[in-house]
UniProtKB/Swiss-Prot annotation:
Pfam families: Polysacc_deac_1. GO terms for cellular component: membrane. This is Probable 4-deoxy-4-formamido-L-arabinose-phosphoundecaprenol deformylase ArnD. The gene is arnD. GO terms for biological process: 4-amino-4-deoxy-alpha-L-arabinopyranosyl undecaprenyl phosphate biosynthetic process; lipid A biosynthetic process; lipopolysaccharide biosynthetic process; response to antibiotic. It comes from Erwinia tasmaniensis (strain DSM 17950 / CFBP 7177 / CIP 109463 / NCPPB 4357 / Et1/99).
Amino acid sequence: MIDVGLRIDVDTWRGTRDGVPNLLSILQRQQTRGSFFFSVGPDNMGRHLWRLLKPRFLWKMLRSNAASLYGWDILLAGTAWPGRRIGQGQAEVIRATARQHEIGLHAWDHFAWQTWAGVWPAERLSAEIRRGVEALADIVGQPVDCSAVAGWRADGQVVAAKQPFDFTYNSDCRGVRPFRPQLPDGSLGTVQIPVTLPTWDEVIGSSVTREGYNDFILDQITQHQGVPVYTIHAEVEGIVLSEMFERLLVEAGRRGIRFCPLGELLPQDVTQLPVGKIVRGHNPGREGWLGCQQLS
C-alpha cells in the first residue's frame, strides 16, 4: 500500500460554499480523509486578473480554460466590490469539515499573500498569519495546528515568521519528502511536508489531456521515490472536476494507493528527518516564484 498525503486547498468563497461540501460527500463515499487548508478572510481572488499581462500566467489560464473551470464569480471576486469574508459567511462548512478531516490555515487573504508575501516585512507576515489563525480557531473552537501558505509563496523569512505559532507541521513548499527546515538564524524550524506532485492547472493542456489526467497522476505516484503529497483545489476538483476526482480515488484504491491527511505522513521521531532549507525557485506550469525544498 502506498500512502499519499491529500492536501485540499480552499481559496475562495465559492470553493468553500460549493466545492467543500461536494468533496466531503465524495471523500465519505470513498472512505478517504485528507487535510483541508482554508482561506478565511476576504475573497479578493479576482484581483489576479492583472497577471494576465504576464505571458506565463496568460498561457496557464488559456490552456486550463479558466473561465469555465473556475467561473466568472471567482475570476472577478473582489474587483468591483469588496471581497466577502469567507470564514464569516461559510463558518458552518468549515466546522463540518473539521469534524471529519484534518484542517489548517491556508491564508487570511489568499490574493494578498500570493502577491505580497515576498516583499512584506517580518512584522506584516506575522500579522497576516496571526489574523488567519485566530479567525480559524474561533470558527472551529480549537487551536490551529498546521498550515500551508497560499501559492507556495514561502522562503526562510516566511518559515521564521511561522515559528511562534507552534504548528505541528507546515506544507509551504514543493519538494520530495518531509524535512526540518533551517531558519535564517541557523536553528531548525517546524517540520515541512512538501507537495511533491503536479496540480491539474500545472500540466493540463501542455503535456497531459483531460482524459489522461487520472492515469498520469496515478503513474506519477507509483513511480515516486520520496513521500508523495498531492494537492487538489475545492474550486476545481470540488466543482467542475468532481466526478473525475472521484474516479481517481476509485482507481487509486484498485492500484493499492491510499490517500490520507498530511499529518499521518510524519514519523514518530521527527528528529530523524533530513535537514534542509526553503529557497525561492520555479516550477514548470506555474507563474512566478515559489518555495522549493533544498536538502542539505
